[in-house]
Amino acid sequence: MCIRDRDVGAGAVMIPQIDSADQARAAVSAAKFSPRGTRGTCRFVRSAAYGGVPGADYFSKAQDTVVILQAEGQKAIDNLDDILSVEGVDIVFVGPYDLSASLGIIGQITHPLVMDRIAQIVQKAAAKGVQVGCFADSAESGRKLLEMGVKFIGYSCDTAIFMNMAKADIAAFHGEH
């Protein structure tokens, strides 16, 4: 599930489409060594300098992998209490586009129904000591999410940010504001 990411040294894994506690348990298990999980144990991987890091140090540090589960639809919200109860879940990340689609309002990520579901996730996660992340496609939506209690914002994408900066520069060249 996330073996390559961990073996190259990723400090966190982000697993999409988690809709149940069973899927959450499988994700956590894949990210952790025994006895907390089922991740294969080998210290001769890139993240351990191919054996250059003492085994005890490597295994201790690698066991601290941050596990981020993506809750991307109404089914995940319906099962959220069970998902949040899985030991080892650090962050639940909301996919607002998928959530909007599951609610029948595809693409409307700031629709009150979507924002209400995100607020429910924040409230339930806070009660379980789990942080919440969410994607924002504008500074305004990012600010609103922070105000709601979301702590981790996945902002836009590199190409959109670059395109918007280029458009602003082109407008400035033409004396437009």
Predicted regions located by residue number:
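Short secondary-structure boundary segments
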Residues: 17, 96, 136, 157
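Short, electropositive alpha-helical surface patch
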Residues: 142-159
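Short, small-residue-biased leader/transition segments that mark boundaries at the very start
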Residues: 1-3
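Glycine-rich, proline-tolerant flexible connector loops at the mouths of alpha/beta enzymes
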Residues: 94-110
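C-terminal helical cap(s) of enzyme catalytic domains, especially alpha/beta-barrels
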Residues: 21-37, 159-177
